[in-house]
């Protein structure tokens, strides 16, 4: 919060060995704190998950802290910039790779008609792609024949995809 001090000025006039004091005057000096933002946790979600509003906070009191932010990857369905809280949104990843957006937040503290900008805080929003399996070819066999090897693959290029499968006819 701002720190203030009151300065009292008392004028004294001297001439010929005589002096007299005049009326005092006062003024206030206010020193605002450096704008600051509390750390923000990184976020990891999957395609089409809802991200709750991201509310920025500060330890500063006695004034107003305004936050401006930028986003370097709008493909996740978040605007390239804004002010204040990042409103909740549905994260989108329409690719087959993880999408990472770096969000940079800059705080500005205002009090007494004076503002100052503090150091930025950066966090990431990671949106993983939807799990996907490449198309499989149906197999037609005669009784007693073995199937060709069935390999499950994906076009997702990072992370790990685990394939679980079931068979609705266990007599085969």
What are these regions (language model features)?
Residues 1-172:
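Extracellular low-complexity Ser/Thr/Asn/Gly-rich intrinsically disordered segments
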